[in-house]
Amino acid sequence: MRLLKFLWWTCVTLICGVLLSFSGAYLYLSPSLPSVEALRNVQLQIPLKVYSEDGKLISEFGEMRRTPIRFADIPQDFIHALLSAEDDNFANHYGVDVKSLMRAAAQLLKSGHIQTGGSTITMQVAKNYFLTNERSFSRKINEILLALQIERQLTKDEILELYVNKIYLGNRAYGIEAAAQVYYGKPIKDLSLAEMAMIAGLPKAPSRYNPLVNPTRSTERRNWILERMLKLGFIDQQRYQAAVEEPINASYHVQTPELNAPYIAEMARAEMVGRYGSEAYTEGYKVITTVRSDLQNAASQSVRDGLIDYDQRHGYRGPETRLPGQTRDAWLKHLGQQRSIGGLEPAIVTQVEKSGIMVMTRDGKEEAVTWDSMKWARPFLSNNSMGPMPRQPADVAQAGDQIRVQRQEDGTLRFVQIPAAQSALISLDPKDGAIRSLVGGFSFEQSNYNRAIQAKRQPGSSFKPFIYSAALDNGFTAASLVNDAPIVFVDEYLDKVWRPKNDTNTFLGPIPLREALYKSRNMVSIRVLQGLGIERAISYITKFGFQRDELPRNFSLALGTATVTPMEIAGAWSVFANGGYKVNPYVIERIESRDGQVLYQANPPRVPVEEQVAADAEDAGNPGDPEHPESAEGEGSIEAQQVAAKAQTTFEPTPAERIIDARTAYIMTSMLQDVIKRGTGRRALALKRTDLAGKTGTTNDSKDGWFSGYNSDYVTSVWVGFDQPETLGRREYGGTVALPIWIRYMGFALKDKPMHTMAEPPGIVSLRIDPVTGRSAAPGTPGAYFEMFKNEDTPPSVNELPPGSFPGSPLPDDEGAPIDLF
């Protein structure tokens, strides 16, 4: 009896001691516990996502893959699987499962250290949101106290929702929705019972039970959970049997971008980090860019096709490496280490036959490459020379060569190589500077250097329109005669002589400015710059957005020796396309928070709406040929009215600054249309459009090739060259390397679009001009042609020439900067 009494009081004492200890711990620790109320407004880390204007995913940035899911959207089968695996008493306890804690305590007494935590789902929520992974008594007590508070303040559904969105499930997947996408490539609601059980088994040990790394352990864990579900009555025998017999079919999935625009994605990422710092990667921001997915795809394909065409004109540089005599397994292992570059897949030649070659691709399949696709592969000697034409496949390849192939639309393979040259393309909406497409190189995987915004290159003759525009705003006209004749500059101090020349090494004598531009006569550009004066010209040109310190203070400026980026060129050319307004290229249209709230809406300077309406409504015809104007059907004013209405309902648009006379922009467009009609841009006539204007550009030794052009819908600039400047080849020019890319792209961009040119502004007249004098022609003058002028710049007739004056002289006597027009 005494013994029983002793045992009774001992138990009572122990229980009281535990209660007192727990109460003391609660009183001591509770003031420092975090507020459970914060869980109602918790902000989980969600990656940054970048989208096109039309909602296509471009890229995702962030360490954690997470897609939050609401409790109402969690499948009941998954809830049952999770409770069976982690906490089958979840519905009944108040945050702490005493039996589980007692079991954990017994293991501690037996082994001397903590083996299992005895944690409920609620306790895991407390740990995941508020505590560390440290294994200690104090942390466990904090966990218990927090769990009790959580159960008092949140519903069971809220607790489960917090849990399934926070847990780490391997392969950078946080939360069950992200895990379903990573392992099965579909949302959690579309998973089978077996697949849900597999994911429910991951929280315990994401690495050990990872189906990609440990399929055997993963299967055992899945089947154990299914058995628990059967015992607990969540599923019947039939569903259990079908689920355990289902094979593990998990594989690694990442959210595939719907649009390949990595250079755009990187531009958006950099801007977001500049705005929000490291939070850009975790706060679930959505960035909607100005890029149109169809135009971006066309731009990427145009650049790749153009570079491959150029590359094949200069011969085959040989295989990337040679692996003769190796086994098939060794070849396959090597291919597994190679990346696809710009859609060009690595392959190893396995056989060489008369009809072509057999190659092994990365999936281990052997496929044929026909001889027809290899005939271009003359040996590369230099950018100016090649070896003899190959006569058979054996002249090009041998077994063991690692080469590149390109999959064609019909499924066949084409023999190719990664181009050595690079390119950039940027296409803008001239009304506001929105970037509609941008390509910064052949392949982002090959090089993330964005040549569209980072490459400072000489633009060559594609810079001349800015010199000519300055001339038109300073007394010159499209009919002004300037002498295309040799000129020599001598630097007496440096004892140097500069003898600029035309590309053809020929000289045409006095010619009108219009002809000089479409024939790209260097001597005329230099003489025009002489007439303007360098400082006056530079002050004028900087209004287009060029940096003053990038513009040389000498007459080589007239030949395009400034250093500029394709982005700067495209932005500057927009001024001609929109009638004289300065717009700034931009790529982010809108930034949204994780819940869809608009945090930022672009409001760039825009061409005034009335100007857009006038341009669309006016049946302006083709200003490039004042003698025979052609009707060009506009898009109508509806689009412009919709733009205006949208702007009025969202924000007050910022009007763009006018930087050149509308008449100057109109006449420049006319002159640049002649570049395509009868000059260096004639290849663009293949598009069969009369509303296109543009200019080629080629620098010394053909180190850079350019083409910039536009209509009223898009301004597009293309550059081609080597990252380390070297010649593209003796017979390569802007018209052979850049213009074909521009034609491919604009052909798609303007497909099914009506002709769209700017309306003729008031204050322009058209006169018949004497080709010999550049003055108004008398009746019956042979070869007289029509030219357009500003009202105040109309030339007098030949009979009105004062004695001793030069025909066509553009500048008044009081502006007599040193000039040698003749």
UniProtKB/Swiss-Prot annotation:
Residues 812-822 have a biased composition (Acidic residues). GO terms for molecular function: penicillin binding; peptidoglycan glycosyltransferase activity; serine-type D-Ala-D-Ala carboxypeptidase activity. It catalyses: [GlcNAc-(1->4)-Mur2Ac(oyl-L-Ala-gamma-D-Glu-L-Lys-D-Ala-D-Ala)](n)-di-trans,octa-cis-undecaprenyl diphosphate + beta-D-GlcNAc-(1->4)-Mur2Ac(oyl-L-Ala-gamma-D-Glu-L-Lys-D-Ala-D-Ala)-di-trans,octa-cis-undecaprenyl diphosphate = [GlcNAc-(1->4)-Mur2Ac(oyl-L-Ala-gamma-D-Glu-L-Lys-D-Ala-D-Ala)](n+1)-di-trans,octa-cis-undecaprenyl diphosphate + di-trans,octa-cis-undecaprenyl diphosphate + H(+); Preferential cleavage: (Ac)2-L-Lys-D-Ala-|-D-Ala. Also transpeptidation of peptidyl-alanyl moieties that are N-acyl substituents of D-alanine. Pathway: Cell wall biogenesis; peptidoglycan biosynthesis. GO terms for biological process: cell wall organization; peptidoglycan biosynthetic process; proteolysis; regulation of cell shape; response to antibiotic. It is found in: Cell inner membrane. It is a single-pass type II membrane protein. Keywords: Antibiotic resistance, Carboxypeptidase, Cell inner membrane, Cell membrane, Cell shape, Cell wall biogenesis/degradation, Glycosyltransferase, Hydrolase, Membrane, Multifunctional enzyme, Peptidoglycan synthesis, Protease, Signal-anchor, Transferase, Transmembrane, Transmembrane helix. Pfam families: PCB_OB, Transgly, Transpeptidase. Residues 403-744 are annotated as: Transpeptidase. The chain crosses the membrane at residues 6-26. The active site is at 86 (proton donor), 461 (acyl-ester intermediate). Signal peptide: none annotated. Residues 48-216 are annotated as: Transglycosylase. Residues 27-822 are periplasmic. The keyword Cell wall biogenesis/degradation applies. InterPro entries: Beta-lactam/transpept-like, Glyco_trans_51, Glycosyltr_51/Transpeptidase, Lysozyme-like_dom_sf, PBP_transglycosylase, PCB_OB, PCN-bd_Tpept. One of its GO terms (cellular component) is outer membrane-bounded periplasmic space. Residues 1-5 are cytoplasmic. Its main location: membrane. Residues 614-654, 790-822 are annotated as: Disordered. It comes from the Bacteria. PANTHER family: BINDING PROTEIN TRANSPEPTIDASE, PUTATIVE-RELATED, PENICILLIN-BINDING PROTEIN 1A. In the N-terminal section; belongs to the glycosyltransferase 51 family. Cell wall formation. Synthesis of cross-linked peptidoglycan from the lipid intermediates. The enzyme has a penicillin-insensitive transglycosylase N-terminal domain (formation of linear glycan strands) and a penicillin-sensitive transpeptidase C-terminal domain (cross-linking of the peptide subunits). This is Penicillin-binding protein 1A. It comes from Pseudomonas aeruginosa (strain ATCC 15692 / DSM 22644 / CIP 104116 / JCM 14847 / LMG 12228 / 1C / PRS 101 / PAO1).
